[in-house]
Amino acid sequence: LQGFQLVIPEMFSNFVKVSFYKHSTNISNDMTKKLILAAAMLLTGSAAVAAQPKVISHRGYWTAPNSAQNSLASFTKADSVGVFGSEIDVWLTADDKLIVNHDRVYKGTDINMEKSTLKEITSIVLPNGENIPTLDAYLRLVAAKPDTRLILEMKSLSDLKREDLAAEKIVKALRKYNLLDRTDII
């Protein structure tokens, strides 16, 4: 086994290179085989860990009883089942406040998230009895759940200036709750 090199899958080639060279007669073939086996087991375990899928709840776990899309309850329920992360949708209101809701116009109403005020939007009662949450209320809840990642979708707005303002306000809010390092913005 002198000069034996363990072949590493390409996905790990930048991280690991294992070579065994028999430099003296003090290392037996049995010892070399054990080292090779240990390295192979380590790499197999690393590959298994790296390949684990991560579950992200879309708009929270809103199909659970007493929940609704993008509600505070949907985030809490998603966190309770151990998801890796939870995705939310964020809009900038007409009075430049950030709210969490999926659709531009709330179903069954004429309330447009971008063209309505915070007061108008937060007066909407969701199917679970909550009101449409502000981003601030949502981030306060996320900050209290340190094991859950946030995937934040900034919704497209009517013009680039409003999108820039929304982005600035989102980053400021994430900083306020120290959540920048565990938030992905899409």
Regions found by a protein language model. Name each.
Residues 50-186:
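Phosphate-group recognition and catalysis centered on beta-loop-alpha active-site segments
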Residues 1-2, 7, 11-53:
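Bacterial Sec-dependent N-terminal signal peptides
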